Amino acid sequence: MILVIDVGNTNIVLGMYDGDNLVHHWRISTDRTKTTDEYGMLVKSLFDHSNVSFEQVEGVILSSVVPPVIFPLEQMSQRYFNVRPIVVGPGVKTGLDIHVENPREVGADRIVNAVAGIAKYDGPLIIVDFGTATTYCYIDEKRRYHGGIISPGIMISVEALYQRAAKLPRIELATPPTVIGKNTIQAMQSGTYYGYVAQVDGIVNRMKREVGEATVIATGGLARLISEHAETIDHVDSFLTLEGLRLIYERNQK
């Protein structure tokens, strides 16, 4: 089986593939201070809970937007699985034609999402990834990646409101019962949630005015919540990044 690892700023998502089937997946917090052995023991506990053994891991691929976490995960793969991992970056075959000023600046997560998006949905595509930052990427019908948009994630907005406004409480992100809030918490929830929904629809519509019609895919931890009221999202694919990692792994075995 193949272990795929997606390292984000807030969470690390791991998936285990048997062929092209995702048979297990886990989410843990990203911790820049963890050592190789600490990550190894954490992964072992996840494996034990799912009745998976280290010996079943035949290959590992990882993408990361947090450089300090790459080394301990590489070492973990070699020490505990006896496998040298593929790290998504320059020199790794993706099959994607990148049309931006500096291709090396494009985040590994955005490349991985684009690979999976084209394989599953064909182009043209707009992929919206709701993470610590929210990213919007455009890929045309010829598999050319043209760049996109990076904006602060919704949870950054929630936290900033609490930290910078003295009388406002920290809130849980939730869909309020009405747009017009009847109390402070509802008003804050409405502002963050519906404000973000409006941002998504506004940005996607502006992108479409520039490039024409495109299928819009949402992924990331908050994709389902936002898509409940976002009018421009066509599909929610929670495991798009994991699928992209699997595809890139396979392309680099040939």
Curated annotation (Swiss-Prot):
Its main location: cytoplasm. It is found in: Cytoplasm. It comes from the Bacteria. Pathway: Cofactor biosynthesis; coenzyme A biosynthesis; CoA from (R)-pantothenate: step 1/5. Keywords: ATP-binding, Coenzyme A biosynthesis, Cytoplasm, Kinase, Metal-binding, Nucleotide-binding, Potassium, Transferase. Its EC number is 2.7.1.33. Disulfide bonds: none annotated. Its cofactor is NH4(+); K(+). Pfam families: Pan_kinase. The active site is at D109 (proton acceptor). A monovalent cation. Ammonium or potassium. CDD domains: ASKHA_NBD_PanK-III (cd24015). Belongs to the type III pantothenate kinase family. Catalyzes the phosphorylation of pantothenate (Pan), the first step in CoA biosynthesis. This is Type III pantothenate kinase. It comes from Exiguobacterium sp. (strain ATCC BAA-1283 / AT1b). The gene is coaX.
